[in-house]
Amino acid sequence: EALPGYAPQSPMVFTGIFPTEGEDYPELRDALEKLQLNDAALVFEPESSAALGFGFRCGFLGLLHMDTVQERLEREYGLGLIATAPSVSYEVLLKTGDSITIDNPSKLPENHAYDEIREPWVNITIVSPARYIGAIMELVTSKRGEYRKMEYLESIATQDSDTETAANRDARVMLEYDIPLSEILVDFHDKLKSGTQGYASMDYSIIDNRAADLVKLDVLVNHEPVDALSMITHRGEAASYGRA
């Protein structure tokens, strides 16, 4: 009997994983089942794609969990893999009054069938030397982040001298933002490290779901949509993603 107060952990990040060789599908299934024996947070279900064949839709606790599982599948089981762009789960409010949760862009109903899409938001904490505050703020703002607070973790000098100014620039500062989870899935961490010369660290926690102006972006190859390349994105970013 389970102890009271505990609940299974819910996956927050989802991606499709397909073998590069179609005949490796059974081996991929067996490998995922073996990993799941020691990793109850890993969830997966069969998925088929017209472009990529048979694979699995996998759910992870976060980005590190996703990267670790993919790396183990390749290293420990010798599998060649194709992974689709990571996504989050969205809450879709239907015109019937019901709501559904989707973790695959291909499952989003037609525009006329729903009133609203809600996406998960996280509270993100970034710790960095103070000299990189400007670069961090610019990055988070470009990702639809909402500023919450900033706090110096070390006392700063108040007298005006070259030595003390340098010390102030190296003092650690903590910045706190609310930001959509989808905005930190792909390149956020790399850009954060690049903009701070590797000095910044980050942590985040889920806070709630919020309504957003989201649309489904289909990618066409030879004038035909490729389901594996579809994504849900903010309307204002759809054009730039489509051209990328």
Kindly give the residue locations of the regions a language model identified.
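Structural and coupling elements of P-loop NTPases
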Residues: 1-244
